[in-house]
């Protein structure tokens, strides 16, 4: 079992409440296979992986927001392409 010290992660995010929200959001992405881990998994649970990513500065809310905007844009473009094929 991995032990994670969250003090460094708190310093990256700002406060422990935002850290909890950010780590939960990232862990959900990892668990549902929407994203690949940015650190070695080492047989850790998604929450531990999320905390390690945050601690290393690889993930924060701004990064996840940008990824989600990019995903939404790509999905919108794919839907537009599908509609244009159906109406052509």
Curated annotation (Swiss-Prot):
GO terms for biological process: DNA-templated transcription. It holds the Pfam family RNA_pol_Rpb6. GO terms for molecular function: DNA binding; DNA-directed RNA polymerase activity. Keywords: DNA-directed RNA polymerase, Nucleotidyltransferase, Transcription, Transferase. One of its GO terms (cellular component) is DNA-directed RNA polymerase complex. Belongs to the RNA polymerase subunit omega family. Promotes RNA polymerase assembly. Latches the N- and C-terminal regions of the beta' subunit thereby facilitating its interaction with the beta and alpha subunits. This is DNA-directed RNA polymerase subunit omega. The lineage of its organism: Bacteria, Pseudomonadati, Pseudomonadota, Gammaproteobacteria, Pasteurellales.
